[in-house]
């Protein structure tokens, strides 16, 4: 089941995210956020964009996806940066694709028109997921971050919804 996250999901989301921070280069954070910080992130995303969770058959949070501002400048307000994290053993089961699509649908219904995501290279799973959902490559920052003893490249992909005529309505 996919649903809107609440601050009560913070511990589960923090537990899912921690190995991405400590054991991989997928996240450029170096210290995993504690549940109280994750609760603040959830609340902030819910106020401005969206944060969804994927529950397994037992009702346990098995993944999450969220959108946030692409930039703080006003003319970017219809554009989002999006991210998804699943329990490491849950990848390639179809749940991630359904969760991410639900996030994109939620954000589109709220008036957002452009979705951007960055991924540390190489990351075949993320590249494949984004490609399957219609994202297109827009560029790569070379050696932009240093983690686990090496400089890392970050590729950016973008999904643009069809252009609207006239002035867009404000995202909500």
Predicted segments, located by residue:
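A short beta-loop-alpha structural element at the N-terminal edge
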Residues: 1-13
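Acidic/histidine-enriched, glycine/proline-rich intrinsically disordered or flexible terminal extensions
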Residues: 163-172
């Amino acid at each position: 089941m996919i649903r809107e996250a609440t601050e009560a999901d913070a511990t589960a989301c923090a537990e899912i995210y921690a190995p991405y921070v400590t054991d991989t280069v997928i996240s450029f954070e170096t210290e995993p956020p504690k549940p109280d910080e994750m609760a603040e992130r959830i609340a902030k995303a819910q106020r401005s964009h969206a944060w969804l969770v994927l529950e397994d058959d037992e009702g346990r949070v098995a993944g999450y996806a969220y959108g946030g501002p692409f930039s703080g400048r006003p003319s970017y307000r219809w554009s989002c940066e999006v991210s998804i994290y699943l329990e490491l053993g849950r990848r390639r089961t179809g749940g991630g694709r359904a969760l991410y699509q639900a996030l994109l649908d939620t954000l589109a219904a709220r008036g957002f028109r452009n979705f951007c995501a960055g991924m540390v290279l190489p990351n075949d799973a993320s590249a494949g997921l984004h490609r399957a959902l219609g994202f297109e490559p827009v560029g790569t920052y070379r050696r932009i971050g240093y983690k686990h003893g090496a400089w890392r490249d970050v590729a950016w992909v973008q999904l643009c919804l069809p252009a609207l005529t006239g002035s867009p309505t404000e995202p909500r």
